[in-house]
Amino acid sequence: MDWSEEGVVLGVRRQGENNVVLELLTRDHGRHLGLVRGGRGRRLRPVLQTGNIVDAAWRGRLAEHLGTFTVEALEMNAARIMDDPARLSGLMTMATHARLLPEREPHHRLYDAFRIVLNQMNTEEIWPTLLVRWELGLLEELGFGLDLGKCAATGSTVDLIYVSPKSGKAVSADAGAPYKSKLFALPAFVTGRSADEPTGQDIFDGFRLTGFFLEKHLYGPRGIDLPDSRAALLTRLSETG
């Protein structure tokens, strides 16, 4: 069994003296692991950094085996991201989230969106909003998507400014006003309702919304906490915003 495909490096773990087990996110083969011989060596170590794009060839005797990867660098994203603490925290947050995906199950839209966030990480005013939307996409891909198209109480499609923590559904301004202290804010950029540039508060409201549902549906049931890198990201954004 063998295949070749581009993939995003999610991380590695040491295997013996010189080898590593590489974890990739690929478009057609999903989250996939494989042994890289010499992965701790001088040539490959810089290549196998989280966020880099590699051309990977996987080979195994049987499809269910761990198998081996041979890799070549395509995009060395880690070098341009690691010098900025906020971008680095954002990258590590995405990589940690991606490890929640079932192995070897393709998620094309989520992979494509991951690449878009990576490509935009030098654009300070864009990438945090894209990361919020990527987290929403992760929830949707794993069966916990939010219903943000109409008001849960009235069916209205206008003035949707809240989200119910119980149902994950949007709530309009009028219907939510008596309960607004118990509802999450729904920033306009999340649903594309406004062309205005999101404020710092909008971005924090977006991360607060996604963080609640990530913990509720994905992290909490697994008995694990949201990534430390995500908390660090919010701290960094507050310092710069």
Model-identified regions with their sequence ranges:
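Non-catalytic alpha-helical scaffolds and adjoining flexible linkers that form interface surfaces
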Residues: 1-21, 25-241
